[in-house]
């Protein structure tokens, strides 16, 4: 049996831009993408901590160390610049692998730089 599991997440980054006229996606600083093991064009789920919106899109890389978090296209309507968001990425794995898997969690500072990288621990 294949299970959909949290692969990684970028926790509490700040939206720096919202570009309604762009063709879809979220632009994420490449340094954050690397830290969270998120690939270009990978599907992500985004939760806006400020307004409760939850939606999906795909990732395009921003310039490394640019601190950019930009929602593009229709997703730009779901956020405001300055909102805090959580970006989550999922993967499929078999049940045996899932039992021992620990997702990557990238904690961000207020300026979207990396504060800490860790793994979820089981309770």
Swiss-Prot record:
GO cellular component: cytosol
Domain of life, per lineage: Bacteria
GO biological process: alanine biosynthetic process; pantothenate biosynthetic process
Cofactor note (record): Binds 1 pyruvoyl group covalently per subunit.
UniProt catalytic activity: L-aspartate + H(+) = beta-alanine + CO2
Top-level EC class: lyase
Cystine crosslinks: none
Location in the cell: Cytoplasm
Active-site positions on this chain: 25 (schiff-base intermediate with substrate), 58 (proton donor)
Cofactor(s), by name: pyruvate
Matching Pfam families: Asp_decarbox (PF02261)
Keywords of the record: Autocatalytic cleavage, Cytoplasm, Decarboxylase, Lyase, Pantothenate biosynthesis, Pyruvate, Schiff base, Zymogen
Major localization listed first in the record, in broad terms: cytoplasm
Molecular function terms from GO: aspartate 1-decarboxylase activity
Stored InterPro entries: Asp_de-COase-like_dom_sf, Asp_decarbox
UniProt PTM comment: Is synthesized initially as an inactive proenzyme, which is activated by self-cleavage at a specific serine bond to produce a beta-subunit with a hydroxyl group at its C-terminus and an alpha-subunit with a pyruvoyl group at its N-terminus.
In-chain residues carrying the UniProt-annotated modification Pyruvic acid (Ser): 25
EC number, as in UniProt: 4.1.1.11
Pathways involved: Cofactor biosynthesis; (R)-pantothenate biosynthesis; beta-alanine from L-aspartate: step 1/1
SUPFAM superfamilies named among the record's database cross-references: ADC-like (SSF50692)
Annotated function: Catalyzes the pyruvoyl-dependent decarboxylation of aspartate to produce beta-alanine.
Quaternary state and interactors: Heterooctamer of four alpha and four beta subunits.
Protein name: Aspartate 1-decarboxylase
Source organism of this protein record: Clostridium novyi (strain NT)
Gene name for this UniProt entry: panD
């Amino acid at each position: 049996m294949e299970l959909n599991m949290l692969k990684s997440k970028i926790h509490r980054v700040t939206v720096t831009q919202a570009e309604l006229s762009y063709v879809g996606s979220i632009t994420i600083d490449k340094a954050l993408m690397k830290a969270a093991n998120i690939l270009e064009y990978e599907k992500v789920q985004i939760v806006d901590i400020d307004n409760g919106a939850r939606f999906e899109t795909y990732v395009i890389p921003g310039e490394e160390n640019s601190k950019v978090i930009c929602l593009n296209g229709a997703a730009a309507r779901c956020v405001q610049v300055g909102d805090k968001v959580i970006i989550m990425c999922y993967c499929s794995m078999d049940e045996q692998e899932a039992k021992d898997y620990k997702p990557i969690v990238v904690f961000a500072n207020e300026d979207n730089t990396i504060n800490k990288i860790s793994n979820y621990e089981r309770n």
